[in-house]
Amino acid sequence: MLDNWFIGQSMSHPLHILAQSLLTFCFPNMPLLSNQQSGEAYAYEGLKNILSGDNVKEFLFEYRHYHSHWPLIHIATFDPFSANPGLVLAMCCIGAVYSDKLGSAEVRWLMERVRESVLKTSQVYKLAQAHQMANLDHQLAATTEEVQALVLLHSQFLWHGSQQLRQQVRDDVRALANVTRSASLFQPLSRDNPNASALHQPGPVTGEEVNSWNWNRWIENEKRARLTAYIYLIDASSTIFFNTQPRYDVNNITVPLPADDATWEARTSEDCASALGLRGPAAQKDNESGSRRAKQLALSEALCVLNGACPGQFPERATNAFGKFGMSIAFSLTYRMLIVVSSHPRRPCPNLSHPATASAKSVFKWRKHTPITGRQSWYWHATKRSQ
């Protein structure tokens, strides 16, 4: 990510105007607070001091450190001046952790104020509470940005919050699960959706993808794929580190794994198409470390082949770094559940009725019936030690 990645997108809009719009997002009635002595008025003044133009610039600048680990934002097209303010504020909260402008207590205070505002204004959050589905035909980009804001804040509360804040989001995890269902994140968009991307649909590459190539549609679908992987990893990590109940069944995640970094970081439509291989193998020279596949495997598909529940061998160079990391976490979660099943063979496991244990059952079957090979022996010995 460039150091000045967000500067130049809208040079006619000074940063103090961006800061003011973020403040208005949190306090839409701020003209009424100027002469008050209420708690809301004090909160407004506190947030006003934090969200100065210079601080917003600093926080967005520092967000690049987080982005290098979790590239959810499409930097080439992201414009903080026109993006959802809740998403920009969530990015500022994360950037503030890396900045020396604020202490931990101030960062956590900022996190709470931002989350309150995001929950009040998020349309997809309101739809999820009412168990309704978002309109992905006409509001896909807006819905995705709202979910990005909610998920980034959830992650920050979980890993950077105080003990009380961490418990708060662990208690609210059901609401986040409802949001993912409302946005239909774990399944590809239907083929008749005007925003659907051919390269994010199941099935082999047919060649028609070259004629139907649309960079904007590809970006929006790739955002959803990366967001899905991120949400699943948060849930799996919470299960592993905090012993919480898993919320998602990996077998139901049919969106593809994230595409190669070279495609996601491409600055133009043509560069992205070349990195995907739509312009032939020779044009993929800049995609040095990825899978070089126009389509990625789905997480459920990849794990099914790995644990032997599906026929065939795992394709060579089938995943990139992001995909490998996602599968390793998912496999760790499956292994954890397998230990529970194996440790109590005569006692029903309380998690067996939960859909997330389907993968664990598949691996248990694989361990029991599949001859041990060199690649599988490490797993067999690990499970034997746990019994």
Give short role names for the model-derived ranges:
Residues 139-140, 165-168:
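Short, charge-rich binding segments
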